[in-house]
C-alpha cells in the first residue's frame, strides 16, 4: 500500500487451512511393543500451528488387528490431556501381531477428532498373521549409545521370507546377513560402537514373486560428551533502521 507521502509499505503473512480443528499424535516409548512387557504411550493433541490442546477429553481403545482387517477390542481407557496437551497410559500386549491405539478426543469447544495409531508387537509364543508392508525394519529405540545392542524387528507380509540385511551402509561380509523370517518376523541384533556415531543406516531387501522389496532404517547415536550448545544474544531487544548493533555468540560444551 502507499501512504499520503507516497511511501510504499508492504507486508506478508501465512494462513494455515486445515480439514480438522486439531490433530492427535501418538507415540510409544519403544519402536515396537514386546509381548508381555509394559509399554508407555504418549498422546498429544495440537492444532496445525503447534498450539497444544489442554483439557481435551475422550477415550483410547487398544485393538488387535487381524489379518482379515477385523479389529478386536482388548481394553478401553478414559483419558484427558493436561495443561501441556499431553496424556499418557501404560498397557501390554499378550501376543505378537498388529495392534492399534484408537483415540477420540473432544476439546472445550465441542470439536471431536478421531485418530488411529498402528504398531507391531513381537515376542515368543503364538505368531498371529498380519498385513502391513512387503518389508519393514523397526528399531527398538529412538536413540542409542555406544555399547548398546540394537534389536531390529524385520517384518514382511510374506511368511517365511528370506531377507538380506546390510548394516552400516556396507557390503562387507561382517555387515551382510541372510535372515530367515519365522512366519512374518525376525529379530536382528547389532552391537553399536563409537565408530557408528552419530547415526547408522540399516538396509534390507527381499525378492518375492519376481519383485524386489526394499526397506531402510536409521539408528540415531548422539555423540555423548561431544555435543555443543551454541547461542546468540543481541546487545538489546530492539534496534532502529540503520542503527549499528552487536551480538554475543557463545558456545558451551558439556563441562
What do the PLM-derived regions correspond to, one by one?
Residues 1-255:
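A structural signal for beta-strand and strand-to-loop patches characteristic of beta-rich domains
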Amino acid at each position: 500500500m502507499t501512504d499520503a507521502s507516497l511511501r510504499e509499505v508492504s507486508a506478508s503473512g501465512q494462513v494455515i487451512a486445515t480439514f480438522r480443528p486439531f490433530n492427535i499424535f501418538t507415540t510409544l516409548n519403544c519402536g515396537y511393543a514386546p509381548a508381555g512387557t509394559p509399554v508407555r504411550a504418549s498422546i498429544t493433541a495440537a492444532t496445525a500451528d503447534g498450539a497444544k490442546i489442554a483439557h481435551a477429553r475422550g477415550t483410547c481403545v487398544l485393538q488387535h488387528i487381524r489379518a482379515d482387517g477385523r479389529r478386536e477390542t482388548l481394553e478401553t481407557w478414559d483419558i484427558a490431556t493436561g495443561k501441556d496437551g499431553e496424556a499418557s497410559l501404560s498397557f501390554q500386549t499378550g501376543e505378537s501381531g498388529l495392534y492399534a491405539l484408537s483415540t477420540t478426543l473432544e476439546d472445550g469447544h465441542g470439536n471431536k477428532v478421531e485418530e488411529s495409531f498402528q504398531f507391531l508387537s513381537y515376542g515368543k509364543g503364538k505368531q498371529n498373521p498380519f498385513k502391513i508392508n512387503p518389508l519393514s525394519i523397526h528399531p527398538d529405540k529412538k536413540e542409542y549409545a555406544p555399547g548398546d545392542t540394537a534389536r531390529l524387528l524385520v517384518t514382511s507380509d510374506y511368511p517365511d521370507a528370506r531377507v538380506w540385511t546390510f548394516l552400516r551402509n556396507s557390503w562387507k561380509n561382517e555387515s551382510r546377513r541372510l535372515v530367515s523370517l519365522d512366519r512374518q518376523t525376525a529379530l536382528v541384533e547389532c552391537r553399536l560402537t563409537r565408530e557408528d556415531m552419530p547415526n547408522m543406516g540399516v538396509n534390507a531387501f527381499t525378492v518375492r514373486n519376481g519383485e524386489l522389496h526394499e526397506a531402510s532404517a536409521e539408528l540415531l547415536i548422539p555423540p555423548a560428551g561431544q555435543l555443543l550448545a551454541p547461542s546468540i544474544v543481541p546487545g538489546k531487544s530492539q534496534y532502529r533502521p540503520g542503527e549499528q548493533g552487536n551480538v554475543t555468540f557463545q558456545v558451551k560444551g558439556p563441562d
